[in-house]
C-alpha cells in the first residue's frame, strides 16, 4: 500500500534511483495504491547522465510492495521493498530494462511491455 510521501525504489534504468509518491491517481480522494496502480512521483535521487533528473515530476506504476497482493487461491505475494517503474505521457516505460521480479497482476493491456522486459514474473 503506497500513499502520499511514500518512498519507492525505481526498478528500471531510467536514471532515477529513489522516488517519492506525491499523488495516488484514480479517484478524487483515493488514499492507497497497490501493485498495478498508477501514481504521480517526484525524483528524489538520480544518477548522473540519466534520462530523468532530480526534482522532476513523473508518472509511475507500482510493481512491488511490502504489503503484497492477494491471489484468488488465497496466497499472498510480498516483497522486501516498494518499487515502481517510471512512465512517459503515453503510459509506456521510460527505461529499456526492468530490474527484479514483477507480479502477474501487471499482465494487462497497458503494462505488457513491463511484463515482457521483466526478468521474472511471479
Curated annotation (Swiss-Prot):
Any Pfam family matching the protein: Ribosomal_L14
Keyword field: Ribonucleoprotein, Ribosomal protein, RNA-binding, rRNA-binding
PROSITE patterns per record: RIBOSOMAL_L14 (PS00049)
Keyword NAD listed: no
GO cellular component: cytosolic large ribosomal subunit
Entry's Gene Ontology molecular function annotations: large ribosomal subunit rRNA binding; structural constituent of ribosome
Family per record: Belongs to the universal ribosomal protein uL14 family.
Subunit annotation: Part of the 50S ribosomal subunit. Forms a cluster with proteins L3 and L19. In the 70S ribosome, L14 and L19 interact and together make contacts with the 16S rRNA in bridges B5 and B8.
Role: Binds to 23S rRNA. Forms part of two intersubunit bridges in the 70S ribosome.
HAMAP family with a match to the protein in the record: Ribosomal_uL14
Protein's recorded name: Large ribosomal subunit protein uL14
Organism of this sequence: Pseudomonas aeruginosa (strain ATCC 15692 / DSM 22644 / CIP 104116 / JCM 14847 / LMG 12228 / 1C / PRS 101 / PAO1)
Amino acid at each position: 500500500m503506497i500513499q502520499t510521501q511514500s518512498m519507492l525504489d525505481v526498478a528500471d534504468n531510467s536514471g532515477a534511483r529513489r522516488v517519492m509518491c506525491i499523488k495516488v491517481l484514480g479517484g478524487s480522494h483515493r488514499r492507497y495504491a497497490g501493485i498495478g496502480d498508477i501514481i504521480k512521483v517526484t525524483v528524489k535521487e538520480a544518477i548522473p547522465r540519466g534520462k530523468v533528473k532530480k526534482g522532476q515530476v513523473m508518472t509511475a506504476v507500482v510493481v512491488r510492495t511490502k504489503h503484497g497482493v492477494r491471489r484468488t487461491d488465497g496466497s499472498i505475494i510480498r516483497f522486501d521493498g516498494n518499487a515502481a517503474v517510471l512512465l512517459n505521457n503515453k503510459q509506456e516505460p521510460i527505461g529499456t530494462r526492468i530490474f527484479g521480479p514483477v507480479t502477474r497482476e501487471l499482465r494487462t493491456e497497458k503494462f505488457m511491455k513491463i511484463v515482457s522486459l521483466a526478468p521474472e514474473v511471479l
